[in-house]
UniProtKB/Swiss-Prot annotation:
<dbReference type="GO" id="GO:0005737">
    <property type="term" value="C:cytoplasm"/>
</dbReference>
<dbReference type="InterPro" id="IPR003753">
    <property type="entry name" value="Exonuc_VII_L"/>
</dbReference>
<keyword id="KW-0540">Nuclease</keyword>
<dbReference type="Pfam" id="PF02601">
    <property type="entry name" value="Exonuc_VII_L"/>
</dbReference>
<dbReference type="GO" id="GO:0008855">
    <property type="term" value="F:exodeoxyribonuclease VII activity"/>
</dbReference>
<protein>
    <recommendedName>
        <fullName>Exodeoxyribonuclease 7 large subunit</fullName>
        <ecNumber>3.1.11.6</ecNumber>
    </recommendedName>
</protein>
<dbReference type="InterPro" id="IPR025824">
    <property type="entry name" value="OB-fold_nuc-bd_dom"/>
</dbReference>
<comment type="subunit">
    <text>Heterooligomer composed of large and small subunits.</text>
</comment>
<keyword id="KW-0963">Cytoplasm</keyword>
<comment type="function">
    <text>Bidirectionally degrades single-stranded DNA into large acid-insoluble oligonucleotides, which are then degraded further into small acid-soluble oligonucleotides.</text>
</comment>
<dbReference type="Pfam" id="PF13742">
    <property type="entry name" value="tRNA_anti_2"/>
</dbReference>
<dbReference type="GO" id="GO:0009318">
    <property type="term" value="C:exodeoxyribonuclease VII complex"/>
</dbReference>
<dbReference type="GO" id="GO:0003676">
    <property type="term" value="F:nucleic acid binding"/>
</dbReference>
<keyword id="KW-0378">Hydrolase</keyword>
<comment type="similarity">
    <text>Belongs to the XseA family.</text>
</comment>
<keyword id="KW-0269">Exonuclease</keyword>
<dbReference type="GO" id="GO:0006308">
    <property type="term" value="P:DNA catabolic process"/>
</dbReference>
Length: 458
Protein backbone atom coordinates (compact mmCIF):
# COMPACT_ATOMS: atom_id res chain seq x y z
CA UNK A 1 0.00 0.00 0.00
CA UNK A 2 2.90 2.36 0.76
CA UNK A 3 4.39 1.74 -2.71
CA UNK A 4 1.09 2.58 -4.36
CA UNK A 5 0.81 5.87 -2.44
CA UNK A 6 4.31 7.00 -3.58
CA UNK A 7 3.57 6.35 -7.26
CA UNK A 8 3.61 9.47 -9.47
CA UNK A 9 1.10 9.19 -12.29
CA UNK A 10 1.65 11.38 -15.38
CA UNK A 11 -0.64 12.09 -18.27
CA UNK A 12 0.63 11.48 -21.76
CA UNK A 13 0.80 15.21 -22.38
CA UNK A 14 2.74 15.82 -19.18
CA UNK A 15 5.22 13.05 -19.93
CA UNK A 16 5.66 14.30 -23.46
CA UNK A 17 6.30 17.82 -22.18
CA UNK A 18 8.94 16.52 -19.75
CA UNK A 19 10.71 14.59 -22.51
CA UNK A 20 10.55 17.62 -24.79
CA UNK A 21 12.10 19.79 -22.10
CA UNK A 22 14.94 17.31 -21.57
CA UNK A 23 15.66 17.14 -25.29
CA UNK A 24 15.62 20.88 -25.85
CA UNK A 25 17.72 21.53 -22.74
CA UNK A 26 20.41 18.97 -23.53
CA UNK A 27 20.45 19.16 -27.32
CA UNK A 28 20.08 22.87 -27.93
CA UNK A 29 22.52 22.74 -30.86
CA UNK A 30 23.79 19.59 -32.57
CA UNK A 31 25.55 18.84 -35.86
CA UNK A 32 24.28 15.76 -37.69
CA UNK A 33 25.35 14.27 -41.00
CA UNK A 34 23.34 11.91 -43.15
CA UNK A 35 21.44 11.41 -46.39
CA UNK A 36 18.27 13.33 -47.29
CA UNK A 37 15.15 11.33 -48.13
CA UNK A 38 11.39 11.99 -48.30
CA UNK A 39 12.02 15.67 -49.04
CA UNK A 40 8.81 17.75 -49.17
CA UNK A 41 8.48 21.54 -49.47
CA UNK A 42 4.77 22.55 -49.48
CA UNK A 43 3.39 26.00 -50.28
CA UNK A 44 3.86 27.11 -46.68
CA UNK A 45 7.57 27.51 -47.43
CA UNK A 46 8.68 25.09 -44.71
CA UNK A 47 10.77 22.07 -45.69
CA UNK A 48 10.34 18.56 -44.27
CA UNK A 49 12.74 15.65 -44.79
CA UNK A 50 14.24 12.57 -43.19
CA UNK A 51 17.95 12.36 -42.38
CA UNK A 52 19.22 8.79 -42.39
CA UNK A 53 22.27 6.56 -42.37
CA UNK A 54 22.70 2.78 -42.53
CA UNK A 55 21.38 2.20 -38.99
CA UNK A 56 18.81 4.87 -38.15
CA UNK A 57 16.83 7.87 -39.29
CA UNK A 58 15.40 11.06 -37.82
CA UNK A 59 12.68 13.42 -38.97
CA UNK A 60 13.79 17.00 -39.70
CA UNK A 61 12.04 20.28 -40.35
CA UNK A 62 13.49 23.54 -41.67
CA UNK A 63 11.24 26.54 -41.36
CA UNK A 64 10.67 29.05 -44.13
CA UNK A 65 13.11 31.74 -43.02
CA UNK A 66 16.06 29.37 -42.68
CA UNK A 67 15.17 27.50 -45.88
CA UNK A 68 15.09 30.71 -47.94
CA UNK A 69 18.57 31.64 -46.74
CA UNK A 70 20.08 28.48 -48.28
CA UNK A 71 22.40 29.09 -51.20
CA UNK A 72 21.63 25.70 -52.79
CA UNK A 73 18.56 23.51 -53.32
CA UNK A 74 18.45 20.28 -51.25
CA UNK A 75 17.50 17.09 -53.09
CA UNK A 76 16.71 13.49 -52.18
CA UNK A 77 19.84 11.36 -51.98
CA UNK A 78 22.12 14.31 -51.17
CA UNK A 79 24.51 13.84 -48.24
CA UNK A 80 24.50 16.90 -46.01
CA UNK A 81 25.77 18.28 -42.73
CA UNK A 82 23.01 19.99 -40.77
CA UNK A 83 22.89 22.10 -37.63
CA UNK A 84 19.84 22.33 -35.43
CA UNK A 85 18.14 21.62 -32.11
CA UNK A 86 16.27 18.55 -30.95
CA UNK A 87 12.63 18.83 -29.95
CA UNK A 88 9.57 16.65 -29.62
CA UNK A 89 6.55 16.91 -31.86
CA UNK A 90 3.93 16.27 -29.19
CA UNK A 91 0.89 15.36 -31.37
CA UNK A 92 2.75 12.29 -32.67
CA UNK A 93 5.16 11.75 -29.81
CA UNK A 94 8.10 11.83 -32.23
CA UNK A 95 11.35 13.63 -31.65
CA UNK A 96 12.71 15.66 -34.55
CA UNK A 97 15.54 17.97 -35.54
CA UNK A 98 14.68 21.60 -36.24
CA UNK A 99 17.43 22.53 -38.72
CA UNK A 100 18.67 26.08 -39.22
CA UNK A 101 21.67 25.37 -41.50
CA UNK A 102 22.48 22.84 -44.23
CA UNK A 103 25.75 22.22 -46.02
CA UNK A 104 26.42 19.63 -48.74
CA UNK A 105 28.99 17.02 -47.84
CA UNK A 106 32.06 16.94 -50.09
CA UNK A 107 31.37 20.38 -51.60
CA UNK A 108 30.53 23.72 -50.05
CA UNK A 109 27.01 25.04 -50.05
CA UNK A 110 27.96 28.12 -52.05
CA UNK A 111 29.74 26.04 -54.65
CA UNK A 112 26.72 23.75 -54.90
CA UNK A 113 24.43 26.77 -55.31
CA UNK A 114 26.75 28.15 -58.01
CA UNK A 115 26.62 24.88 -59.96
CA UNK A 116 22.84 24.54 -59.65
CA UNK A 117 22.13 28.12 -60.77
CA UNK A 118 24.60 27.86 -63.63
CA UNK A 119 22.91 24.70 -64.93
CA UNK A 120 19.46 26.29 -64.58
CA UNK A 121 20.33 29.49 -66.44
CA UNK A 122 22.24 27.61 -69.13
CA UNK A 123 19.13 25.51 -69.85
CA UNK A 124 17.09 28.72 -70.17
CA UNK A 125 19.58 30.07 -72.73
CA UNK A 126 20.84 33.06 -70.73
CA UNK A 127 24.45 32.25 -71.70
CA UNK A 128 23.75 31.92 -75.42
CA UNK A 129 25.84 33.99 -77.82
CA UNK A 130 22.60 34.91 -79.60
CA UNK A 131 21.78 37.30 -76.73
CA UNK A 132 25.18 39.03 -76.66
CA UNK A 133 25.23 42.72 -77.62
CA UNK A 134 28.28 44.11 -79.40
CA UNK A 135 30.41 46.52 -77.34
CA UNK A 136 30.69 49.94 -79.06
CA UNK A 137 34.22 50.95 -80.11
CA UNK A 138 33.96 54.63 -79.16
CA UNK A 139 31.42 55.04 -76.34
CA UNK A 140 30.59 58.58 -75.29
CA UNK A 141 28.78 57.76 -72.04
CA UNK A 142 29.75 54.87 -69.74
CA UNK A 143 27.71 53.60 -66.79
CA UNK A 144 29.52 52.00 -63.83
CA UNK A 145 27.85 49.81 -61.18
CA UNK A 146 30.21 49.19 -58.25
CA UNK A 147 31.06 50.28 -54.73
CA UNK A 148 31.95 53.98 -54.51
CA UNK A 149 34.68 53.27 -51.94
CA UNK A 150 36.27 50.09 -53.29
CA UNK A 151 39.47 49.57 -55.23
CA UNK A 152 37.51 48.70 -58.37
CA UNK A 153 36.20 52.24 -58.98
CA UNK A 154 39.66 53.71 -58.39
CA UNK A 155 41.22 51.29 -60.88
CA UNK A 156 38.54 52.00 -63.50
CA UNK A 157 38.88 55.78 -63.17
CA UNK A 158 42.68 55.60 -63.29
CA UNK A 159 42.68 53.59 -66.51
CA UNK A 160 40.00 55.75 -68.16
CA UNK A 161 41.83 58.98 -67.29
CA UNK A 162 45.06 57.55 -68.64
CA UNK A 163 43.62 56.16 -71.87
CA UNK A 164 40.87 58.58 -72.86
CA UNK A 165 39.52 61.54 -70.90
CA UNK A 166 36.87 62.69 -73.38
CA UNK A 167 34.18 60.34 -72.09
CA UNK A 168 31.27 60.93 -69.71
CA UNK A 169 30.91 58.63 -66.70
CA UNK A 170 27.70 57.87 -64.79
CA UNK A 171 28.45 55.99 -61.57
CA UNK A 172 25.67 54.10 -59.76
CA UNK A 173 27.00 53.36 -56.24
CA UNK A 174 25.94 50.04 -54.67
CA UNK A 175 27.00 47.59 -52.01
CA UNK A 176 28.89 44.71 -53.61
CA UNK A 177 28.71 42.21 -50.74
CA UNK A 178 26.52 41.36 -47.82
CA UNK A 179 22.79 40.97 -47.46
CA UNK A 180 20.80 42.96 -50.00
CA UNK A 181 23.80 43.68 -52.22
CA UNK A 182 22.51 41.57 -55.12
CA UNK A 183 19.19 43.42 -55.12
CA UNK A 184 20.99 46.80 -55.18
CA UNK A 185 23.17 45.72 -58.12
CA UNK A 186 20.15 44.50 -60.11
CA UNK A 187 18.23 47.73 -59.40
CA UNK A 188 21.22 49.83 -60.46
CA UNK A 189 21.43 47.97 -63.80
CA UNK A 190 17.72 48.59 -64.38
CA UNK A 191 18.10 52.28 -63.42
CA UNK A 192 20.92 52.85 -65.91
CA UNK A 193 18.77 51.30 -68.63
CA UNK A 194 15.99 53.76 -67.80
CA UNK A 195 18.35 56.75 -67.84
CA UNK A 196 19.03 56.31 -71.55
CA UNK A 197 21.96 57.48 -73.68
CA UNK A 198 24.25 54.96 -71.94
CA UNK A 199 26.49 53.33 -74.55
CA UNK A 200 28.03 50.62 -72.36
CA UNK A 201 27.98 49.52 -68.72
CA UNK A 202 30.68 48.10 -66.42
CA UNK A 203 29.41 45.95 -63.52
CA UNK A 204 31.96 44.64 -61.05
CA UNK A 205 34.11 44.81 -57.97
CA UNK A 206 37.59 43.90 -56.76
CA UNK A 207 38.79 40.48 -55.66
CA UNK A 208 37.73 38.53 -52.60
CA UNK A 209 36.59 35.16 -51.33
CA UNK A 210 33.68 33.23 -52.80
CA UNK A 211 31.47 34.65 -50.06
CA UNK A 212 32.62 38.20 -50.85
CA UNK A 213 31.85 37.79 -54.56
CA UNK A 214 28.56 35.99 -53.99
CA UNK A 215 26.29 38.92 -54.86
CA UNK A 216 27.39 38.51 -58.49
CA UNK A 217 26.31 34.84 -58.37
CA UNK A 218 22.73 35.67 -57.42
CA UNK A 219 19.95 34.94 -59.90
CA UNK A 220 18.48 38.44 -59.57
CA UNK A 221 21.73 39.99 -60.88
CA UNK A 222 21.98 37.48 -63.73
CA UNK A 223 18.47 38.25 -64.92
CA UNK A 224 19.02 42.01 -64.68
CA UNK A 225 22.11 41.70 -66.90
CA UNK A 226 20.22 39.48 -69.36
CA UNK A 227 17.33 41.92 -69.80
CA UNK A 228 19.61 44.97 -70.08
CA UNK A 229 19.34 46.77 -73.41
CA UNK A 230 22.73 48.40 -72.72
CA UNK A 231 25.73 46.10 -73.35
CA UNK A 232 27.24 44.95 -70.04
CA UNK A 233 30.89 44.19 -69.28
CA UNK A 234 31.32 42.00 -66.19
CA UNK A 235 34.47 42.76 -64.18
CA UNK A 236 34.38 40.79 -60.93
CA UNK A 237 37.43 39.83 -58.87
CA UNK A 238 40.66 38.63 -60.37
CA UNK A 239 41.41 36.70 -63.55
CA UNK A 240 40.89 33.30 -61.87
CA UNK A 241 37.49 34.28 -60.46
CA UNK A 242 34.38 33.35 -62.43
CA UNK A 243 30.84 34.35 -61.46
CA UNK A 244 27.39 33.81 -62.93
CA UNK A 245 27.48 37.46 -64.03
CA UNK A 246 30.51 36.68 -66.23
CA UNK A 247 28.55 34.06 -68.19
CA UNK A 248 25.47 36.24 -68.71
CA UNK A 249 27.30 39.49 -69.53
CA UNK A 250 27.96 40.55 -73.11
CA UNK A 251 31.71 40.60 -72.37
CA UNK A 252 33.82 39.39 -69.45
CA UNK A 253 36.86 41.29 -68.25
CA UNK A 254 39.38 39.61 -65.97
CA UNK A 255 39.57 42.65 -63.67
CA UNK A 256 37.96 46.10 -63.37
CA UNK A 257 41.13 47.63 -64.86
CA UNK A 258 40.89 45.27 -67.83
CA UNK A 259 37.25 46.31 -68.30
CA UNK A 260 38.28 49.95 -68.50
CA UNK A 261 40.92 49.09 -71.10
CA UNK A 262 38.38 47.14 -73.15
CA UNK A 263 35.69 49.79 -73.08
CA UNK A 264 37.79 52.68 -74.45
CA UNK A 265 40.74 52.83 -76.79
CA UNK A 266 43.98 54.52 -75.80
CA UNK A 267 44.17 58.17 -76.80
CA UNK A 268 47.67 57.53 -78.16
CA UNK A 269 46.43 54.60 -80.21
CA UNK A 270 43.53 56.66 -81.56
CA UNK A 271 45.90 59.53 -82.38
CA UNK A 272 48.24 57.16 -84.21
CA UNK A 273 45.31 55.66 -86.09
CA UNK A 274 44.03 59.12 -87.07
CA UNK A 275 47.52 60.09 -88.25
CA UNK A 276 47.75 56.90 -90.31
CA UNK A 277 44.35 57.59 -91.86
CA UNK A 278 45.38 61.19 -92.56
CA UNK A 279 48.53 59.96 -94.29
CA UNK A 280 46.55 57.52 -96.40
CA UNK A 281 44.09 60.29 -97.29
CA UNK A 282 46.96 62.60 -98.26
CA UNK A 283 48.55 59.93 -100.46
CA UNK A 284 45.20 59.20 -102.10
CA UNK A 285 44.62 62.88 -102.76
CA UNK A 286 48.11 63.25 -104.26
CA UNK A 287 47.52 60.31 -106.62
CA UNK A 288 44.17 61.68 -107.68
CA UNK A 289 45.70 65.10 -108.24
CA UNK A 290 48.44 63.57 -110.39
CA UNK A 291 45.87 61.73 -112.49
CA UNK A 292 43.89 64.95 -112.91
CA UNK A 293 47.03 66.80 -113.97
CA UNK A 294 47.85 64.14 -116.56
CA UNK A 295 44.31 64.38 -117.92
CA UNK A 296 44.51 68.17 -118.09
CA UNK A 297 47.84 67.90 -119.92
CA UNK A 298 46.38 65.51 -122.49
CA UNK A 299 43.35 67.73 -122.98
CA UNK A 300 45.59 70.77 -123.30
CA UNK A 301 47.49 69.12 -126.16
CA UNK A 302 44.25 68.36 -127.95
CA UNK A 303 42.97 71.88 -127.48
CA UNK A 304 46.23 73.51 -128.69
CA UNK A 305 46.12 71.46 -131.97
CA UNK A 306 42.47 71.24 -133.12
CA UNK A 307 43.45 69.91 -136.55
CA UNK A 308 44.71 66.72 -134.91
CA UNK A 309 41.39 66.20 -133.20
CA UNK A 310 39.48 66.95 -136.41
CA UNK A 311 41.73 64.58 -138.35
CA UNK A 312 41.01 61.76 -135.94
CA UNK A 313 37.31 62.51 -136.11
CA UNK A 314 37.30 62.62 -139.93
CA UNK A 315 39.15 59.31 -140.08
CA UNK A 316 36.65 57.76 -137.71
CA UNK A 317 33.73 59.12 -139.78
CA UNK A 318 35.20 57.56 -142.95
CA UNK A 319 35.67 54.25 -141.16
CA UNK A 320 32.11 54.27 -139.86
CA UNK A 321 30.77 55.23 -143.32
CA UNK A 322 32.55 52.31 -144.99
CA UNK A 323 31.38 50.00 -142.27
CA UNK A 324 27.80 51.24 -142.67
CA UNK A 325 27.85 50.57 -146.43
CA UNK A 326 29.30 47.12 -145.89
CA UNK A 327 26.87 46.19 -143.15
CA UNK A 328 23.90 47.52 -145.16
CA UNK A 329 24.92 45.44 -148.18
CA UNK A 330 25.17 42.32 -146.06
CA UNK A 331 21.78 42.99 -144.52
CA UNK A 332 20.16 43.48 -147.95
CA UNK A 333 21.79 40.32 -149.31
CA UNK A 334 20.51 38.31 -146.37
CA UNK A 335 17.03 39.76 -146.79
CA UNK A 336 16.94 39.00 -150.54
CA UNK A 337 18.07 35.43 -150.00
CA UNK A 338 15.44 34.91 -147.33
CA UNK A 339 12.70 36.33 -149.61
CA UNK A 340 13.67 33.88 -152.38
CA UNK A 341 13.60 30.96 -149.93
CA UNK A 342 10.21 31.94 -148.51
CA UNK A 343 8.77 32.44 -152.03
CA UNK A 344 9.83 28.92 -153.03
CA UNK A 345 8.34 27.45 -149.87
CA UNK A 346 5.11 29.40 -150.42
CA UNK A 347 4.79 28.19 -154.03
CA UNK A 348 5.10 24.58 -152.85
CA UNK A 349 2.43 25.08 -150.22
CA UNK A 350 -0.38 26.82 -152.22
CA UNK A 351 -3.99 25.88 -151.29
CA UNK A 352 -4.67 24.56 -154.84
CA UNK A 353 -1.86 22.01 -154.60
CA UNK A 354 -2.93 20.97 -151.13
CA UNK A 355 -6.57 20.58 -152.25
CA UNK A 356 -5.52 18.52 -155.26
CA UNK A 357 -3.48 16.16 -153.09
CA UNK A 358 -6.42 15.67 -150.74
CA UNK A 359 -8.81 15.00 -153.70
CA UNK A 360 -6.46 12.33 -155.06
CA UNK A 361 -6.20 10.75 -151.63
CA UNK A 362 -10.02 10.81 -151.24
CA UNK A 363 -10.52 9.07 -154.62
CA UNK A 364 -8.01 6.37 -153.71
CA UNK A 365 -9.64 5.77 -150.34
CA UNK A 366 -13.16 5.64 -151.92
CA UNK A 367 -12.02 3.00 -154.42
CA UNK A 368 -10.41 0.94 -151.66
CA UNK A 369 -13.60 1.24 -149.60
CA UNK A 370 -15.80 -0.02 -152.51
CA UNK A 371 -13.57 -3.05 -153.07
CA UNK A 372 -13.51 -3.84 -149.35
CA UNK A 373 -17.31 -3.60 -149.03
CA UNK A 374 -17.83 -5.84 -152.10
CA UNK A 375 -15.54 -8.50 -150.65
CA UNK A 376 -17.19 -8.21 -147.25
CA UNK A 377 -20.73 -8.60 -148.67
CA UNK A 378 -19.73 -11.64 -150.79
CA UNK A 379 -18.27 -13.35 -147.73
CA UNK A 380 -21.39 -12.54 -145.71
CA UNK A 381 -23.72 -13.94 -148.43
CA UNK A 382 -21.73 -17.14 -148.61
CA UNK A 383 -21.87 -17.50 -144.79
CA UNK A 384 -25.64 -16.91 -144.80
CA UNK A 385 -26.16 -19.59 -147.50
CA UNK A 386 -24.19 -22.15 -145.55
CA UNK A 387 -26.04 -21.34 -142.34
CA UNK A 388 -29.42 -21.58 -144.12
CA UNK A 389 -28.61 -25.02 -145.50
CA UNK A 390 -27.50 -26.24 -142.10
CA UNK A 391 -30.59 -24.77 -140.46
CA UNK A 392 -32.93 -26.42 -142.97
CA UNK A 393 -31.21 -29.77 -142.45
CA UNK A 394 -31.87 -29.74 -138.73
CA UNK A 395 -35.21 -27.89 -138.75
CA UNK A 396 -38.18 -29.82 -137.26
CA UNK A 397 -40.38 -28.51 -140.06
CA UNK A 398 -38.22 -30.28 -142.64
CA UNK A 399 -38.54 -33.50 -140.67
CA UNK A 400 -42.33 -33.13 -140.44
CA UNK A 401 -42.55 -32.59 -144.20
CA UNK A 402 -41.11 -36.06 -144.69
CA UNK A 403 -44.07 -37.69 -142.84
CA UNK A 404 -42.92 -37.48 -139.26
CA UNK A 405 -44.88 -35.92 -136.37
CA UNK A 406 -44.21 -34.38 -132.94
CA UNK A 407 -46.19 -35.62 -129.93
CA UNK A 408 -46.66 -33.37 -126.85
CA UNK A 409 -48.17 -34.57 -123.58
CA UNK A 410 -50.94 -32.40 -122.26
CA UNK A 411 -51.49 -30.26 -120.40
CA UNK A 412 -47.74 -29.39 -119.94
CA UNK A 413 -47.12 -29.72 -123.70
CA UNK A 414 -43.85 -31.53 -123.01
CA UNK A 415 -42.38 -33.35 -126.04
CA UNK A 416 -42.80 -37.14 -125.86
CA UNK A 417 -39.64 -39.03 -126.87
CA UNK A 418 -40.44 -42.43 -125.32
CA UNK A 419 -43.52 -44.57 -124.71
CA UNK A 420 -42.46 -44.73 -121.08
CA UNK A 421 -43.68 -41.16 -120.71
CA UNK A 422 -47.27 -42.19 -121.56
CA UNK A 423 -50.02 -44.16 -119.90
CA UNK A 424 -53.44 -45.23 -121.16
CA UNK A 425 -55.90 -42.39 -120.93
CA UNK A 426 -53.26 -39.58 -121.32
CA UNK A 427 -54.21 -36.73 -123.62
CA UNK A 428 -51.64 -35.84 -126.27
CA UNK A 429 -51.30 -33.34 -129.14
CA UNK A 430 -49.80 -34.63 -132.39
CA UNK A 431 -48.30 -31.98 -134.71
CA UNK A 432 -47.88 -32.67 -138.49
CA UNK A 433 -46.26 -30.74 -141.27
CA UNK A 434 -49.66 -29.22 -141.77
CA UNK A 435 -51.98 -29.05 -138.74
CA UNK A 436 -52.31 -31.05 -135.51
CA UNK A 437 -54.67 -33.52 -133.76
CA UNK A 438 -55.76 -34.18 -130.16
CA UNK A 439 -55.62 -37.88 -129.23
CA UNK A 440 -56.21 -40.17 -126.28
CA UNK A 441 -53.68 -42.92 -125.49
CA UNK A 442 -55.31 -46.32 -125.41
CA UNK A 443 -52.16 -48.41 -125.06
CA UNK A 444 -48.42 -47.69 -124.53
CA UNK A 445 -45.92 -50.44 -125.31
CA UNK A 446 -42.23 -50.84 -124.61
CA UNK A 447 -39.73 -50.29 -127.36
CA UNK A 448 -39.53 -54.04 -128.13
CA UNK A 449 -43.32 -54.65 -127.93
CA UNK A 450 -45.67 -54.22 -130.84
CA UNK A 451 -49.02 -52.61 -130.45
CA UNK A 452 -52.16 -54.76 -130.81
CA UNK A 453 -55.13 -53.02 -132.16
CA UNK A 454 -58.13 -53.33 -129.90
CA UNK A 455 -60.92 -55.47 -131.25
CA UNK A 456 -63.62 -53.61 -132.94
CA UNK A 457 -67.20 -54.40 -132.23
CA UNK A 458 -69.35 -54.94 -135.24
Amino acid sequence: MQLFKERRVLTVSALTALVRGLLEENFEQVWVEGEISNLACPQSGHCYFTLKDAGAQIRCVMFRGAFRSLKFTPRDGMRILTRGRLTLFEPRGEYQLVADYLEPQGIGGLQMAFIQLKEKLAKEGLFSELHKIEIPKLPRRIGIVTSPTGAAIRDILTVLNRRFTNVELLISPVRVQGEGAAREIADAIDDLNRVGNIDVMIVGRGGGSLEDLWAFNEEVVARAIHRSKVPVISAVGHEIDFTIADFVADLRAATPSAAAELVVASKKELTAEVEALSHRLHVSQQRRLERSRALVTALSRAITDPSRVLGHLAQRVDSLDARLVREAGLILDDASERIVTLTARLSRQTPALTLKRWEERLATLSLRLDHAMTRRLACAAESVGLATGTLNAVSPLATLSRGYSITRKLPARSVVTSSRQLAPGDRVEVSFAAGSALCTVEQASRESDSLTAPPRSV
